[in-house]
């Protein structure tokens, strides 16, 4: 449940990063595939992915 709530919060804060997380975690896409779907460079995808993972880790840890 904590991940679901954190994803909802991320979507409100940064919808693009939330969409990336959905594509990577739940859609099973690679970074390059997700970058293509989102129309961003692979380097940007990597930065956004690192940020989103860290952000979610902090949010989920704070809810426990």
Question: What would you call each of these model-derived segments?
Answer:
Residues 11-33:
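Short amphipathic alpha helix immediately N-terminal
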Residues 27-47:
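Helix-turn-helix DNA-binding module
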């Amino acid at each position: 449940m904590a991940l679901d709530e954190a994803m909802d919060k991320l979507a409100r804060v940064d919808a693009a990063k939330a969409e990336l997380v959905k594509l990577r975690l739940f859609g099973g896409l690679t970074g390059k595939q997700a970058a293509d779907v989102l129309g961003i460079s692979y380097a940007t995808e990597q930065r956004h992915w690192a940020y989103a993972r860290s952000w979610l880790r902090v949010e989920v840890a704070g809810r426990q």
